[in-house]
Amino acid sequence: MEPVIIGALILDVHAKPSTTPISGTTVPGQVLFAPGGVARNVADCIFKLGITPFMIGTLGLDGPANVLLKEWKLSMKGILRREDISTPIVSLVYDTNGEVAAGVAGVDAVENFLTPEWIQRFEYNISSARLLMVDANLSSLALEASCKLAAESSVPVWFEPVSVTKSQRIASIAKYVTIVSPNQDELIAMANALCAKNLFHPFRSDENKLSIEDMFRALKPAILVLLKNGVKVVIVTLGSNGALLCSKGNPKKALNIDRKFLRSGEVFKRVQSVCSPNRFSELGSNRSPSLFAMHFPTIPAKVKKLTGAGDCLVGGTVASLSDGLDLIQSLAVGIASAKAAVESDDNVPPEFKLDLISGDAELVYNGAKMLMVHQSML
């Protein structure tokens, strides 16, 4: 079976001003509708990279749902639709640099209707999945139900934090989670939630100018909290500074994916040929519960907007893992997919050109460098 994705399908309303937004009045620009929601974006990205995920979510029987489903090509079996459900909508106002300046999210339907009972109907899909990804739009009860079903069959779980506030829902499920993918602020919020004290403070804007090594040192205590609470892999997204891959020991062995039955499709063939797994073969000797950390760079992009980048990083990584690549190769594909996302007007590009993705993944992979290996976590 292919990966299972559980979470939000949302209609995004994007307001893109031609000039700097002014409080209290309107400015000229474009207002566009775009399919969105972390889980939906991840599933769409995976599908466009040649893997067919199974999506579990909820939608209304209304106009916004019809817009969302217009280009939907995946199974509808896992998507609950009822007349009393209002399809989730998020309205975003961008600044002239393509970053979100303000937004309002009306996504209560995800928590109210995507219940443990609905999720448990798809026990077979989850128990036989390559990997389960859940987004933090789910209620705590729904997250626990999803993770327990996966744990019963040793299916790896990827937790996508969604936002600073919702990222704290990691507290009740950390022991089930294999991978998390926070940005710096979400990482701090998750660490505080797990240690039940506000020991860590939000990253200051001037700290983004630190060297990668200094940035890692600043984030390391929070990363260790997650790893010591059961999470096996922490991928910290750093925006234009790339991403950190941190794990207990060898990250290639962190996921319990049976590689005998992986499909080895087009993504695998193209990336395996340019991203040699032997480049990091020395990791194979690491059997101790030590801290591993690696930095992955970004590559130059013609940025149109930044929403969707993190979702495509996750989607590209999950698709690659499902196709047989190791975690380091897969994250390189994820970062290449994120680049394609920021160069698109949509949250997920209409298509991914695999020659460009594999070429960009090669650049990321060859630029990756280890920051720490074989140091005790104690």
Swiss-Prot record:
Record note on what altering T26V does: Reduces kinase activity 13-fold
Any one Gene Ontology cellular component term annotated for this protein: peroxisome
Annotated binding of pseudouridine, by residue: D12, T26, G37, V38, A39, R40, N41, N137, K166, D311
Domain of life of the native organism: Eukaryota
EC number: 2.7.1.83
Consequence of substituting D311A: Reduces kinase activity 171-fold
Reaction(s) catalysed (UniProt annotation): pseudouridine + ATP = psi-UMP + ADP + H(+)
Keyword Nucleotidyltransferase: no
Residues engaged in binding ATP: T237, G239, G242, T298, L306, G310
GO terms for MF: ATP binding; kinase activity; metal ion binding
Cited InterPro entries: Carboh/pur_kinase_PfkB_CS, PfkB_dom, Ribo/fructo_kinase, Ribokinase-like
UniProt-reported outcome of changing V303A: Reduces kinase activity 3-fold
Residues holding Mg(2+): S181, T237
Subcellular location(s) of the protein: Peroxisome
Metal-binding recorded as keyword: yes
Enzyme class: transferase
Alphabetically ordered keywords of this record: ATP-binding, Kinase, Magnesium, Metal-binding, Nucleotide-binding, Peroxisome, Transferase
Function according to Swiss-Prot or TrEMBL: Catalyzes the phosphorylation of pseudouridine to pseudouridine 5'-phosphate (PsiMP). Catalyzes the first step in a pseudouridine degradation pathway. Acts together with the pseudouridine 5'-phosphate glycosidase PUMY in the peroxisome to prevent toxic pseudouridine monophosphate accumulation.
Stated family: Belongs to the carbohydrate kinase PfkB family.
The protein's assembly and partners: Forms homodimers.
Protein name according to UniProt: Pseudouridine kinase
Organism: Arabidopsis thaliana
Organism lineage: Eukaryota, Viridiplantae, Streptophyta, Embryophyta, Tracheophyta
Gene name tied to this protein: PUKI
